[in-house]
Amino acid sequence: HKASGNPSPPVLICVLNGAFMFFSDLVKDMGIEIEVDFIRARSYTGTDNSAGVSFTKELEIDLTGKRVYIVDDMVDTGKTMNAVKEKVLKGGAPDAKGRPQDVKVVTLVDRKSGTYPVDFTCFPEMGEEWFVGYGFDLNGLCRNYRNIYDSKA
């Protein structure tokens, strides 16, 4: 991370609840010093995401001048990620003094129909199935499955 010209460690932000399993595995294998923070954003009720985005856990780290990676399970419409990124760009913690140096988006799954630009993804161009397992849920259940499944399979 020092090769970036920024001596401070990067900050990885986990978007709860969906990204917690992916985030945990990712940070364990980073091999460099990092800071972590968590934000909880909700835009789905069941499989419906027509409501607005609400936050029930805010960022605590001052992100001023830092390289930030927002880690989520999936970017679907981009509504949740837009809201999260807006908070990150304001500097994170309520007492933040400025903006981050750089912000990247990391996802486990990227939809084929996705219109939101993702910087890093593990599974690009996935279909429109509703996934369960490995953090993905259906009405709050199934997150603890070790693998990802199509909920209708």
Residue ranges and their predicted role:
Residues 1-153:
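PRPP-associated nucleotide enzymes
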